[in-house]
Amino acid sequence: MGQDTDMLNTYQQLVRTPSVRPGQDVRLQAPGTRTGLLKLLSTVSQDKQGCLGSGDGVPNQDLQQRSQSSRQTAKKDRKPRGQSKKGQGSEESEDHFPLLPRKPSFPFQWAWESIATDVRAVLQPSSPTPGHQALPMPSSFSQRQSRRKSTANLPEAHGCCWKTEAQNLKARQQLGAWGGVSIPTGKGELGSEPPSGLQLPGRRPGSGSASDKQVQLQSLGAEEAERGLSSGVLPQRPRRGSISEEEQFSEATEEAEEGEHRTPCRRRAGCQRKGQISGEEASDEGEVQGQSQGSSPSFNNLRRRQWRKTRAKELQGPWDLEKLHRQLQRDLDCGPQKLPWKTLRAAFQASKRNGKAYASGYDETFVSANLPNRTFHKRQEATRSLLQAWERQRQEERQQAELRRARTQHVQRQVAHCLAAYAPRGSRGPGAAQRKLEELRRQERQRFAEYQAELQGIQHRVQARPFLFQQAMQANARLTVTRRFSQVLSALGLDEEQLLSEAGKVDREGTPRKPRSHRSMGVRMEHSPQRPPRTEPTGSQPDRHYNPSLDPECSP
């Protein structure tokens, strides 16, 4: 009876202890699952608790049947999550205990029954003295401690897998509440060491060594269950019978170490894949960086070399015109219908060996592109037209290059001819200056002779028209004499018109006739617009005019 009171006090302490700790994350604890469960367990009557305090650690038949039904219900709930295997302990218990209909009970009673059955399975192989047997810490409490440590020590550098874990947080909490088994929420939870054990008050330090080992074994079993759930396999309970406690502890430790090595490797591989993707995105700028933690430099060098080879092949590309030209010539030689299937298969295998099949769906594309169907003929015709256009372009470029070369040679020949014409043969001799001076004098004499010939031509042209020149000179002389005669008459005070009329009368009466030329010239002068009354402006007329004025008959 005292042991029952001690167990009740222990569970009341466990109820109060996690609720007052300040560092506990309230979000990771579903309301009403564990704290309410332990409160309800603390109020269970003494006859229900008497079966646990009997000293042998084995519950009664009713508790075994209800725990068996609760395990079956929990396994049915876990089956939709991808777990199809069953534990060995459940198969043995199904053989021994028949299935009975479940009695109505308080909420989450089956969770506590599974915890009690796990405790019984752990305590059965080695049971020390009944009076000093320590009650192991429940897996829910160790789970809360490990989860609190993991959430407190979770590094920010491992944020690559945080989105996926945050999305499945509700599912993990629900699964942990059903089976009392936690699922790791990050890398820090697997890496954190489980608590060594909970020493109950009032016990001696030496008497709790077996309970410490059992608590460590239970925490390692919880971690193994977490790893099994994460890998998709049901956790198996420790085998009963001839296996001792030390063998169980060593096996659990080895499995825990292997699981801790496997899980970071898996996560490291996922981070490496993310790093490879980000490195391929940054490879266009020439920066290949490994985003994963723990990736070796040799792996980065290998990735860089592979990327360079792929990049070189992509730069070489399928549009190598020489290769297309050769392939087109082969197709034209053998014909599209004569292309055998073995040649297609050999070409396909060669392309796969060369690494040209980048995607998984490239195989069908390659086969359908090389089969002699309508698409193949259209593609071949397009390739042929492309090659013909390329050949025409190359021929035009060749012709233009030849034309440019011929034009350049012609210009060079002209320049050489001009230089040879302007540079005398012996221009580099000792008498070059004298010869140059003689050449200049010869050119000057030649130019002077040309000028003299031009002047002689002008003179010959003037002499060929003498009448025109004479008429011009006579007209100029006549105008000058008439102007002078008018000035003299005006100075003497004589009337020019009266004098001209009298002179005309005298001329008609007795003067001999003058030459025809003079008369004609006088007539022309009378009809001139300047002085119409003037007649016969010859040199003998003034003497004839002055003579009558000197005559005594005409004098006043």
UniProtKB/Swiss-Prot annotation:
<feature type="region of interest" description="Disordered">
    <location>
        <begin position="503"/>
        <end position="556"/>
    </location>
</feature>
<feature type="region of interest" description="Disordered">
    <location>
        <begin position="123"/>
        <end position="155"/>
    </location>
</feature>
<feature type="region of interest" description="Disordered">
    <location>
        <begin position="50"/>
        <end position="102"/>
    </location>
</feature>
<feature type="compositionally biased region" description="Acidic residues">
    <location>
        <begin position="244"/>
        <end position="258"/>
    </location>
</feature>
<feature type="region of interest" description="Disordered">
    <location>
        <begin position="1"/>
        <end position="31"/>
    </location>
</feature>
<feature type="coiled-coil region">
    <location>
        <begin position="379"/>
        <end position="464"/>
    </location>
</feature>
<protein>
    <recommendedName>
        <fullName>Testis-specific protein 10-interacting protein</fullName>
    </recommendedName>
</protein>
<keyword id="KW-0175">Coiled coil</keyword>
<feature type="region of interest" description="Disordered">
    <location>
        <begin position="179"/>
        <end position="309"/>
    </location>
</feature>
<dbReference type="GO" id="GO:0005856">
    <property type="term" value="C:cytoskeleton"/>
</dbReference>
<feature type="compositionally biased region" description="Polar residues">
    <location>
        <begin position="289"/>
        <end position="301"/>
    </location>
</feature>
<feature type="compositionally biased region" description="Polar residues">
    <location>
        <begin position="1"/>
        <end position="16"/>
    </location>
</feature>
<feature type="compositionally biased region" description="Polar residues">
    <location>
        <begin position="208"/>
        <end position="219"/>
    </location>
</feature>
<dbReference type="InterPro" id="IPR051655">
    <property type="entry name" value="FAM161"/>
</dbReference>
<dbReference type="GO" id="GO:0044782">
    <property type="term" value="P:cilium organization"/>
</dbReference>
<dbReference type="GO" id="GO:0032391">
    <property type="term" value="C:photoreceptor connecting cilium"/>
</dbReference>
